[in-house]
Amino acid sequence: MGHHVGNASTSQAWTEHCNDLIRRVCDLFPTNFVPVCQLPQSPQTPIGTSITELRRCVEEMGFIGCNLNPDPSGGYWKDLPLGDKYWYSLYETMCDLDVPAMIHVSGACHPAMHTTSSFYLGADTTAFVHFMMSDVFTDFPSIKFIIPHGGGAVPYHWGRFRGMAQDMGLGDLNERVLGNIFFDTCVYHQDGIDMLTKVIPTENILFASEMIGAVRGIDPRSGHYYDDTKRYIDATPNLDDAQRKMVFEGNARRVFSRFPL
């Protein structure tokens, strides 16, 4: 994505080219890929161009979802929280088109943040808190968001967030967020997947792995790639066969309702 590079015009042109290429790849390999688009975001700019591009991708090219960057500045967090009404016209369009958004930042520019560790996982956690403390899911009850990397720190600290929601008078956390937020399985050790599948309901977990990801090496303890997440899901004692099928396939088909059957 690279939303921190250039200006709004740069992002617009780059995004359109990237989305056209995504459509081309999906046409070349229709049994391997379905298209999800990036949006032409740029720090502190109107969200209208993202709405136009989302409609182009979904209505004209058959895309089934989008990626939403909560911090186009690359770590300086210049834009408003995801619960702010700045985002509402985009959320309205997502609901109108019935497409989910993956919440995912791009490269880190802030010298205190490493892109694929502190920035990614911190942004995942921050996005969750934005939604938890806002009225987004009340105002848009059908909206769907996927938080990657197993939700950042969220499942590990579910008790903290439950307690905060309770103290703030927000009600039961599960009821407040789990109708709209889903977590992927880009978690690179067995204990992490075990914890995710124990804390988060199966209905809210979507399978994910990497093509070129944050960790590319082989774990010397297991002899397998760190990001071979299917192995962890197959091995966890917290799922039966029916639940594994939900994680591997069923949940994604439900969340990405435009997925071609």
Each predicted region: which residue ranges?
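Active-site gating/metal-coordination segments in enzymes
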Residues: 1-127
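Generic hydrophobic alpha-helical segments
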Residues: 50-54, 133, 193
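H/E-rich (His + Asp/Glu) clusters that bind or coordinate divalent metals
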Residues: 112-132, 140, 144-261
